Amino acid sequence: MTESWVVIFTSTRTSQDADGYRAMAAQMEALAHAQPGFISMQSVRGDDGVGITVCYWESEQSIAAWKRNVDHASAQQQGISTWYSDYSVTIAKVERQYGKRNSLFK
């Protein structure tokens, strides 16, 4: 395994602007995929509005560049003001990764 870093974003959605949220989430996913250092992303959200997005990056520098992306920063501000009742971000270096891959992560 090559060195990688992970950003774990957990959130609880409000009921506000569901269509706008879905559109922005799709736009941010496409934008993240185009960023230098991006490896992969998986997201899930329950019926209760609680969600988690796990995004893998090649380096801390690529994560910092993603955070500075103007479109991403704008989406973050809209998320804080409209779409999320709470959220947290965890950034960590991946020391070990193993398991059985299945269709959930393809």
Model segments located where?
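Short S/T/G/P-rich N-terminal loop/turn motif that feeds into the first structured element of a domain
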Residues: 1-51, 60-68, 84-106
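Short arginine-rich
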Residues: 76-79, 83-86
